Regions:
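Conserved beta-strand/short-helix segments
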Residues: 1-312
Length: 312
């Protein structure tokens, strides 16, 4: 789900109609798990459905609606199972030769009417990269996670063609101008490694982007740990924060939890940035602490109880 003012968007990634576009026939369930999004608006104290939205190239197992983000009159929808081998913005949607490569669809509302504005793919589309597994929209900036992307690049705008780091993950940033959407950055972790899943969760707020790699393995703790290369805490997880000046992105900080341990998956299911505040969930954290700033972070007496960490 995503809420913006009096508008609520709800994803149903396993919905199965073969409709396309906005307001199609919902009753023909011949496209299994193609997915759909429902938009509701509030007037006074009452909610009503405003739109039923499908992909422009509906296909089985696309999971349209698995991720979505609403910002004012703009809605971004991820379909991580979409299968075309197109690249960039506005490519050929009908060539299903890259299974699970994924796509993102942007819709714009004028008055009460929704219409598709853009069809977006990765610049280095690859089968099973799952582009669109996560999306985050802030004004004219869109961040898209592809957690199973395979390149061994690091940092900003590296070489995305060398697929020797399987499922390391990547994030793509797009920006809207008067002429439409275009890719602004291709982002990888500073310590890219196979299986880290960089991009399983993304959150953008203005010129700040937070990216989770829930399967990152380092044994570091806290802010900017210098042990990124020590992979002795499997799936402990990490979050990377990037900032933009003009059109240039750079990594600002590398974050681990203060009590980072194996299988905590810090950031995997939850990361949210708003202004100067960042919240990160770790659903596999095991401490028996309760409330705020418990002093029992090292007591692993409550298996998978989970925790949330706030950074500023």
């Amino acid at each position: 789900m995503s809420l913006s003012g009096d508008t609520l968007a709800v994803g149903a990634p396993y919905e199965s109609s073969n409709a396309t576009g906005v307001g199609g026939d919902q009753t023909n369930n011949t496209s299994t798990s193609s997915g759909a999004v429902y938009v509701f608006t509030r007037s006074g104290g009452s909610w009503a459905q405003q739109a039923y939205i499908k992909a422009s190239n509906t296909g089985p197992a696309a999971a349209f609606g698995h991720s979505l983000s609403l910002s004012g009159d703009t809605l971004a929808v991820g379909a991580y199972g979409e299968a075309s081998n197109a690249t960039g913005v506005g490519g050929n949607q009908n060539n299903s030769m890259a299974t699970g490569s994924g796509a993102v669809y942007v819709f714009l509302r004028t008055g009460t009417v929704w219409a598709q504005q853009a069809y977006i793919k990765a610049s280095n589309t690859g089968a099973n990269d799952q582009f669109g597994y996560s999306v985050s929209l802030s004004g004219d900036t869109l961040a898209v996670g592809a957690p199973l992307e395979d390149s061994n690049a690091t940092g900003i705008d590296g070489n995305g063609a060398n697929n020797t780091a399987t499922d390391s993950g990547a994030v793509y940033v797009f920006r809207r101008s008067y002429s439409g959407w275009s890719q602004e950055a291709y982002i990888k972790a500073s310590n890219t490694e196979a299986g880290d899943g960089f991009g399983y969760n993304v959150s953008v707020s203005g010129d700040t982007l937070a990216v989770a790699a829930g399967y990152e393995d380092s044994n570091g703790q806290g802010v900017n740990s210098n042990t990124q290369a020590d992979n002795s805490e499997s799936a402990s997880g990490a979050v990377y924060v990037f900032t933009r000046i003009g059109t240039v992105w750079r990594q600002q900080v590398y974050l681990k939890s203060s009590n980072s341990q194996r299988d905590d998956q810090f950031g995997y299911y939850g990361v949210s940035v708003s202004g100067d505040t960042l919240a990160v969930g770790a659903h596999g954290e095991d401490s028996s602490g309760t409330g705020v700033n418990s002093n029992t972070q090292g007591d692993n007496g409550a298996f998978n109880s989970g925790a949330v960490y706030i950074f500023r």
